Amino acid sequence: MIEEQKPNNSTETAISPMQCYVQPFFRLLHKDCFLAIREIESNSIDLIVTDPPYGINLSKGYKSGSEELVKGDDGFTIMVFVDELMQEFSRILKLNSAIYVFTRFDVYPYWWLKMKNYFETKNQIIWSKGGGGVGDLQGNYIHNYESIIYATNGKHKLRNKREGSVWQIPKCKLEFHETEKPVELIEKIIVKSSDEGMVVFDPFMGGGTTGIACKNLNRSFVGIEMIETNFITAKSRIENHCPQIRVFP
């Protein structure tokens, strides 16, 4: 079941991710994250996986307030609301559950410190994605990894076998979003920190990859996306995706 909620819906009700644990549900909201997240019931989310926007100038390889940024990726706006965002995350996340936030080397320390005020920050996971990069090709080393902050709300138990914090997963072709992540990477996070039927939340849904991973793994999904083109893409992908059975050690 996929439920869509648009910005000017006069019949809005509180989001209740406790609806069904046998057959997963999918609720997609085309709204501003900071407005939509307030509708989510407290202690109703089992896992948060998200890649918040941050500013980057692709032509020069550094942040700039005057240059054109990646569409929908205004890091200077998002930083103002990090405290508010973390406060809401801590409200909706169940006790003994986990949160994973993608970030980058230059904004990682800021996010880590902010998250530490609300969660128990556990690890910096390094996603080694391989390949080349963009920006200053002569003056910079190739940027071939991303940081993921893993934190918990209480004593969270990881599933399956214990493993290291460097994950070597090839990056995917950018078909649906400017900062698209491989489905395999999101699936790995979901399998390590949730069980079938649990509710996964992504407030910056982008092209819908987290929803695709949830569909493959029999998890319920609540996703928010403000940019209309991204929302349409994500909704279409999730609706038309045929789940693929995955086996994880």
Give the ranges of each region predicted by the language model.
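Core catalytic lobe of class I
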Residues: 1-9, 13-232
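Short, conserved SAM-binding/catalytic segment
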Residues: 14-23, 235-249
